[in-house]
C-alpha cells in the first residue's frame, strides 16, 4: 500500500462520474476542515494479508494524526500513487476497514472508490504537512506496548540551555548535519531528497570495491580485493582502538537456538527483522549482533568487582538482519554486515556512566580519524535524565568545547527498550540523510535476563552492561567515507579516501620505455617501505595512464621522464591537495616521497597491496 498524508486546512470533493468498478454509495460529495487527508493506493501485495495491511495503515494514520493533534481524517482512494494496484474488490474492503477502525476515535470522511472525482485541498505547508508512507503486510510482534511519545531538544553546550524542538527552531538551524539527523528523527521528508541512487553505490562498482552477489539473498555482497583490503584495514583500526581502551577480543557463533528463553526474549526485544529458520526440531536464528554469544560467555564467567569494568569485543563477521527488499540501499542498509561490537560489564550505574562517557569520546574519535564529522543525539528516559542532569550537561559542555557543536536530546517518558540511555552518532550522505554509525547504550535488563552476576563478597550483584560499536558496521563506515568523497567534489576537490585506506597509495608511471627500468626501481623502493605502490607498464598513452590513476583515486601519482631520471627529483601529483581541474604537483626525491606518505598515514593500520605490482597483469573484476 502506498499512502500520501497531507495535513490540510480542508479537503473538499465531488464525485462526478462512475467507472465500471465504482462502489455504490450515497456519499457523492463532502468536505472536512482541519483534517489529515490520507490518499491511498491498495497494491497487489496487500492481497496476501489484508488484515495486516489494514492494521499497519491504521497505526501509521493514528501516529501521524496524534503528532499533528488532529481528530478529523479523510480516507481518499488514489490509484495514481502506484503502478501495481490490487484488485478493486480487495481495495474496497481494505478502505472500508480502515474507515471502520478509525471511526471509534476520529471523525472520518471516506471518498467513494471507483469514481472520477473533483477535489480541492489546502495543505498547511509546515515540515510535517506532507508525508509519504509505504505500508506493508508485515505482522509486527504481538506485544502490548504502551505508546511512547518522545520530546526532542537542542542542547547548547556553551550555556547549557535546552530548547524544545518546534517548527521555528527547525527553520533557524544552521548545522546541516544536525538538522538532517533531527529531520530523520521527526520523520520529516523533503521532496527530491530520496530520488536516485546514492553516489556510493556507483563508486563501489566503479572502483571494484564490492557488488551485489546475484546468486545469494538480496542485500549480500561479494568483495573484490580492493574492497576486502579496505574492510580489513577498517577492522584492524577498530581492533587496535578497542584493545588500546581495554577491550578483550573474543569470537562467538553466528547461530542461536531460540528455545533458550534468554536468547528468545532478547531477540524479541530487539525488534529488528531477523533470519529465522527451522532445522530438525530446533528453531534457530542468525545473530543480528554479538550480544548473544558475549552474554552467554559472561554468564559462565566468575566475575569479581576487581574485574570491572570488563570489556569483551568481537568483530561479528557476519551479523544478519532481514531488511525489506525495498529498503536495501547499497552499503547503508543490507542484510549481512560486519559489526564491531563491545560489551562492558560495570559494577554499578556510576561506573557505567563513566564508561559511557569514555566510549562516547572513543566513538567521536573515529569520526576525526575518518574525516567524517558526526552529528549526535543523546537519548534518555525521563527518570534517568532527571537523576543525572549534571552528568549530561558536563558531557554536552565538553562536546561543545571540543567540536563547537550542539547536540540533540531525546527524552522518552518511559523505558521501551532494554536501555535507559544511549548516544547515536551519524554522518550525513549526499542526499542529506543520516548514516547512523557509532553508538553507546546503557543496558539495565540483559544481566538479569542472561543470569550475569558479579560476586561481591557474599553478595551476587547484577551489573549494568554497556553496548558499544565504536564505528558502527564496517560497511556503513565505508558508505560514509564514499558519500563524503562525493561531497568533496561539490567543493571543487577530487573524490578520495584517506591515504591509509586507499588501496593504491602510489602509482609510478614512466613516460616512455627508456624510463621503465628507473620507474620500476622507484615503485619497488616504495613497496619496500610499506607503501602500497604499483607500476603502470601498460601500452597506453601517457594521458590515459594519468586519467586511469585519477579514476583509481591514487593518492600519489609519480610521473618519470628524462628530467626525473637526470635529477632524481620525481614529479608527484598529490590528490588530496589538488582541485578538480587543477592538480597539485610537487618535486620530491624518493626518500622525501616515502617520508611524506609515511607522515600522511601516521600510525594507521598497514597492509600490503593484494594486487600484482604491474598494472598490465592486474585482473579486471567487473
UniProtKB/Swiss-Prot annotation:
Which residues participate in Zn(2+) binding? 291, 343, 467
Q: Write down the PANTHER family for this protein, in alphabetical order.
A: THREONINE--TRNA LIGASE, CHLOROPLASTIC_MITOCHONDRIAL 2, THREONINE-TRNA LIGASE
Under catalytic activity, the entry for this protein gives: tRNA(Thr) + L-threonine + ATP = L-threonyl-tRNA(Thr) + AMP + diphosphate + H(+)
- Organism equals Methanococcus maripaludis (strain C5 / ATCC BAA-1333)
What protein family does this chain belong to?
A: Belongs to the class-II aminoacyl-tRNA synthetase family.
Alphabetically sorted, this entry's keywords are: Aminoacyl-tRNA synthetase, ATP-binding, Cytoplasm, Ligase, Metal-binding, Nucleotide-binding, Protein biosynthesis, RNA-binding, tRNA-binding, Zinc
The role this protein plays is: Catalyzes the attachment of threonine to tRNA(Thr) in a two-step reaction: L-threonine is first activated by ATP to form Thr-AMP and then transferred to the acceptor end of tRNA(Thr). Also edits incorrectly charged L-seryl-tRNA(Thr).
One GO term under biological process is: threonyl-tRNA aminoacylation
Query: Major location, coarse class?
Result: cytoplasm
**Cofactor(s) recorded in Swiss-Prot or TrEMBL:** Zn(2+)
Self-association state and partner proteins as the record states: Homodimer.
Q: What is known of its domains?
A: The N-terminal domain is an archaea-specific tRNA-editing domain that hydrolyzes incorrectly charged L-seryl-tRNA(Thr). Catalysis of tRNA editing is performed by the charged tRNA itself.
- Recorded E.C. number(s)? 6.1.1.3
Spans traversing the lipid bilayer: none
Q: Which Pfam families match?
A: HGTP_anticodon (PF03129), tRNA-synt_2b (PF00587), tRNA-Thr_ED (PF08915)
Provide one Gene Ontology cellular component: cytoplasm
**Cofactor: binding details:** Binds 1 zinc ion per subunit.
Gene Ontology molecular function, alphabetical: ATP binding; threonine-tRNA ligase activity; tRNA binding; zinc ion binding
Q: What is the lineage of its organism?
A: Archaea, Methanobacteriati, Methanobacteriota, Methanomada group, Methanococci
Q: What are the boundaries of the region Editing domain?
A: 1-141
- First-level EC class: ligase
Q: What protein am I looking at?
A: Threonine--tRNA ligase
Compartment annotation: Cytoplasm
Q: Where is this region: Catalytic?
A: 199-498
InterPro entries on file? aa-tRNA-synt_IIb, aa-tRNA-synth_II, aa-tRNA-synth_II/BPL/LPL, Anticodon-bd, Anticodon-bd_dom_sf, DTD-like_sf, Thr-tRNA-ligase_IIa, Threonyl-tRNA_syn_edit_dom_arc
